[in-house]
C-alpha cells in the first residue's frame, strides 16, 4: 500500500501548477501595466518551480519507500518485527 501522504502531496502540487497555468491563460495583458504583468509571470514561475520541486521530492520519497520495503522483506522471517512493519507501513 502506497502511503497516502505521497499521493496527496503529488496531487496538491499538480493542482497548484495546473490551476496557475489555467488562471494565466485567461489574462489579457493589454489591459494590465507592464510591471504587473512581469510580477504576475514571476509569481507563476515561482509557483511552477515550487510545484515541480514538490513533485520531485514526493517521487524521491516514493522510491525510498520502495527501497525500504524491499530491504525489509529480504530479511529472514525470524528477524522481522511486526511493530516496525506497522510503523513503516510495509505490510
UniProtKB/Swiss-Prot annotation:
It is found in: Host endoplasmic reticulum membrane. It is a single-pass type I membrane protein. It holds the Pfam family Adeno_E3B. Residues 61-91 are cytoplasmic. Keywords: Early protein, Host endoplasmic reticulum, Host membrane, Membrane, Signal, Transmembrane, Transmembrane helix. One of its GO terms (cellular component) is host cell endoplasmic reticulum membrane. It comes from the Viruses. Residues 23-34 are lumenal. Belongs to the adenoviridae E3B family. Down-regulates the EGF receptor. This is Early E3B 10.4 kDa protein. It comes from Human adenovirus C serotype 6.
Amino acid at each position: 500500500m502506497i502511503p497516502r501522504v505521497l499521493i496527496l502531496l503529488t496531487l496538491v502540487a499538480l493542482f497548484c501548477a495546473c490551476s496557475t497555468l489555467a488562471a494565466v491563460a485567461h489574462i489579457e495583458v493589454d489591459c494590465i501595466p507592464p510591471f504587473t504583468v512581469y510580477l504576475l509571470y514571476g509569481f507563476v514561475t515561482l509557483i511552477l518551480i515550487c510545484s515541480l520541486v514538490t513533485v520531485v521530492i514526493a517521487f524521491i520519497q516514493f522510491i525510498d519507500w520502495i527501497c525500504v520495503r524491499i530491504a525489509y522483506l529480504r530479511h529472514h522471517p525470524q528477524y522481522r518485527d511486526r511493530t516496525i512493519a506497522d510503523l513503516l507501513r510495509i505490510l
